[in-house]
């Protein structure tokens, strides 16, 4: 039952889609999402950060930071995590030269720290996937060089990866567990055909963030319950590791722009599983 008080949604999931993108910062509607989330009984919103016009995002603008704080307090919606789609859109670990990108990363860490955001999700999937060994080596060197800065700013980096369970464990063990962890995405793991029991066996103790979605094996994101995710088993395993952090809905979008209603359907589905598990 504790999980019910940890539910939240990805920013943009309670707003109309922009340019037909499944996920992007809802520049016109981000304020309204606080009241929408409150009305749905959610406790968290996970902030999103795109590479395009990155520093126009409210987390970098003093006046808008104050608005975020006021809305968060007014509607009792916490912002404890940020998904950096900007990293996936412009993966600096695939570049020979990356000085500016690392400088930008430190600015993002600072902005999150200012707002009391604790977790930054770095997606190592799709365009951000570590396809070459040198990508991985470069990423490890860069992020490990930031440990003292992360400690000072009280930030934890969460990697979301397409690595198989054993390989992901070997990867995450190359980082200090006080400042790094894994963001587990239910849908992505199901789409890749991974065995959820093996995943929790190999790296369950490193999971510090969760994205809830459903996907078809090797296929698209679908409404919860219509894909290959075994949510009953997932929540039993999540309970077994004594997971206490936020659980963020990154679910399929409504096909007719009724996103709040779509979230309501998904929330009902997961709430029932949690109560009966």
Language-model regions: role of each:
Residues 248-259:
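A short, acidic, flexible beta-alpha connecting loop/helix-capping segment that sits on the rim
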Residues 1-107, 113, 161, 169, ...:
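N-terminal pre-domain/capping segments
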Residues 42, 117, 207, 243-244:
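A structural motif
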Residues 6, 15, 20, 82, ...:
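Acidic/histidine-rich catalytic cores of soluble enzymes
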Residues 64-84, 140-153, 231-234:
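Alpha-helix-loop-beta-strand connector modules within alpha/beta enzyme cores
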Residues 60-66, 98-105, 135-143, 195-199, ...:
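Charged helix-capping and loop-helix junction motifs
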Residues 114-132, 161-162:
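Active-site groove signature of glycoside hydrolases
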Residues 96-119, 139-150:
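An active-site-proximal structural segment forming one wall of the substrate-binding cleft
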């Amino acid at each position: 039952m504790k999980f019910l008080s940890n539910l939240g949604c990805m920013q943009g999931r309670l707003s109309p889609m922009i340019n037909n993108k499944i996920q992007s910062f809802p520049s016109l509607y981000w304020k309204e999402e606080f009241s929408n989330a409150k009305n749905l009984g959610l406790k968290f919103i996970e902030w999103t950060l795109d590479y395009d016009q990155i520093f126009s995002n409210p987390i970098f603008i003093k006046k808008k930071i104050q608005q975020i704080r006021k809305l968060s307090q007014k509607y009792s919606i916490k912002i404890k995590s940020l998904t950096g789609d900007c990293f996936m859109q412009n993966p600096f670990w695939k570049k020979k030269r990356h000085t500016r990108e690392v400088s930008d990363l430190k600015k993002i860490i600072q902005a999150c720290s200012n707002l009391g955001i604790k977790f930054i999700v770095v997606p190592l999937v799709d365009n951000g996937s570590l396809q070459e060994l040198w990508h991985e080596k470069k990423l490890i060197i860069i992020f490990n060089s930031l440990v003292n800065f992360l400690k000072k700013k009280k930030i934890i980096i969460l990697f979301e990866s397409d690595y198989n369970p054993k390989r992901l464990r070997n990867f995450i063990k190359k980082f200090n567990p006080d400042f790094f962890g894994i963001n587990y995405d239910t849908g992505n793991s199901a789409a890749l055909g991974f065995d959820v029991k093996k995943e929790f066996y190999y790296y369950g103790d490193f999971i510090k963030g969760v994205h809830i979605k459903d996907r078809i094996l090797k296929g698209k994101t679908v409404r919860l319950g219509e894909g290959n995710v075994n949510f009953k088993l997932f929540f039993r395993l999540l309970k077994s590791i004594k997971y206490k952090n936020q659980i963020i809905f990154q679910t399929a979008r409504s096909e007719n722009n009724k996103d709040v209603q779509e979230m309501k359907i998904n929330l009902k589905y997961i709430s029932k599983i949690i109560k009966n598990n």
